[in-house]
Amino acid sequence: MKRLVGGAALLVAVAIGGAYLNPYNIYDAAAEAGKSYVGSKACASCHEEEYENFIKYSKKAHSFHSVQLMRKELTSSELKECFHCHTTGYGKPGGFISEKQTPDLKNLGCETCHGPGSAHVDSEDASDILGKVDKDSCKACHNTDRVRAFRYKPMLYAGAH
C-alpha cells in the first residue's frame, strides 16, 4: 500500500513539475479534453469583424514572418523554440507541426489566446472556448526576457478586441 501511495504521489509531482517546466503548457488540459486547433479562418464565419481586424492590424497574425527572417541563422532546436511563441498550438495535441502539415497554424491566431476552438466551432457555445483572457495568459511569451516593454491593454486592443 505504501508503495502504491508513494508511486501515485510521485506521478502527481512529476505532472505538476512538468507543467511548471514548460511555460507554454497553458491549454494542454483543453486539448486533452478532446478539443483541437482549427485555425483562425474557422472563427471568421461568426466573428468576421474581429477576424478582419486581427488580420489587418495585429502583428501577431503575421508572427511567423519573424521566424522566416531568422531561420537561416538558427539551429533546428533554436527554431523549434521560436515556434512556441510564433505559431498556434506548437507542442500541443493538434497544434502547429510544420508549414507544410499545418499551414493554418503557422502564425499566432485566435486560439493562441482563446485555446483550441474545435468544440466551440462545432457547438457555437461560448462555454466551449476561453472568452476573457487576462494578462497572466500572455506571460509565457510576453515577459521581460523577450519583450522590452509589454503593455497589456494596447496589445489587447491591437489584437482586434
Which residue ranges define each predicted feature?
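Positively charged n-region of N-terminal signal peptides that target proteins for export
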Residues: 1-4
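Hydrophobic membrane-insertion alpha-helices, especially the h-region
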Residues: 6-22
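Sequence context of c-type cytochrome heme-c attachment sites
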Residues: 17-134, 150-161
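Domain-level detector of nuclease and nuclease-like folds
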Residues: 139, 143-145
